């Protein structure tokens, strides 16, 4: 019972960190562009997180049980590794994929315990992690090219429509993060009403108290994005994460979105994109996974 409470507490802490940190990914653009206020953005993010968790969170059940034995001892180690890695990355101001750290540590712990995870699932995860960024870049690039070659006749009316669509895209991004990343955490913890309630509370706490400093436009740090570009990047990445959720594969929202931002930037030949932040993120994707695996294996 005591170990269960410790595990749930660690799960709550990780949920708080994930919710607050990833709010910039889902609603940072609409808040930063002043389409809506911060608190409205927080409300959209919270509603999206919780809706995704409740409606599709169970989709990650097999992945959670196949990657890590259902032992509160092992689960608590995986969660502790992820929390520690996140705190260190925050102090170093380095981007980090919590999803990849958590998956990597789960695999490392399983192998250390003498259990080989489902190889078919591992291949599917690796394939999705490679294919998703490539597809996100391609979709964003081609979609923006089409819009550039076929500019709207009524610019103001289109801008208003794009603002509304961008809000929808932000909600959908929050929804897929709740279904995938938070759903994976829910199933690692074993699910149930107690765990679900604790996670919902964690979502609210993280979104309200940890989002103020991180609601930044991810796209604007790499590229000055238009409404259309931001909408396409958000929708393409969210759709890919939704597909991964349906397939039962944990996938990082920031991974897909960062790739989508690059695709949008590459579509504009007259404006250069700063590729260094994206290359840094790609490097941390790889490091995050292997760091999680290494720590999970040796602990």
Kindly give the residue locations of the regions a language model identified.
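Multi-pass alpha-helical transmembrane bundle typical of ion/small-solute transporters
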Residues: 1-299
């Amino acid at each position: 019972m005591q170990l269960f409470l410790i595990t749930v507490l660690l799960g709550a802490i990780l949920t708080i960190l994930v919710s607050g940190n990833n709010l910039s990914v889902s609603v940072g653009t609409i808040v930063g562009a002043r389409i809506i206020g911060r608190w409205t953005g927080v409300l959209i993010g919270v509603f999206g997180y919780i809706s995704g968790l409740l409606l599709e969170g169970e989709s990650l059940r097999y992945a959670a049980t196949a990657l890590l034995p259902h032992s509160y001892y092992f689960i608590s180690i995986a969660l502790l590794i992820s929390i520690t890695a996140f705190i260190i990355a925050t102090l170093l101001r380095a981007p980090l994929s919590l999803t990849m750290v958590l998956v990597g540590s789960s695999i490392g712990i399983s192998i250390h315990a003498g259990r080989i995870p489902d190889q078919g699932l591992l291949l599917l995860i690796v394939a999705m992690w490679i294919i998703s960024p490539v597809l996100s870049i391609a979709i964003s690039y081609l979609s923006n090219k089409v819009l550039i070659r076929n500019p709207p006749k009524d610019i103001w009316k289109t801008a208003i429509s794009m603002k509304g669509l961008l809000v929808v895209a932000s909600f959908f991004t929050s929804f897929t993060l709740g279904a995938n990343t938070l759903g994976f955490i829910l199933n690692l913890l074993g699910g149930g009403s107690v765990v679900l309630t604790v996670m919902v509370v964690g979502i609210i706490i993280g979104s309200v108290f940890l989002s103020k400093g991180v609601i930044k436009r991810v796209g604007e740090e790499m590229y000055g994005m238009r409404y259309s570009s931001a909408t396409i990047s958000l929708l393409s990445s969210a759709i890919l994460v939704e597909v991964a959720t349906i397939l039962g594969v944990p996938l990082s929202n920031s991974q897909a979105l960062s790739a989508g931002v690059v695709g949008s930037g590459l579509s504009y030949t007259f404006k250069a994109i700063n590729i260094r932040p994206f290359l840094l993120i790609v490097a941390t994707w790889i490091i995050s996974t292997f760091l999680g695996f290494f720590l999970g294996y040796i602990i």
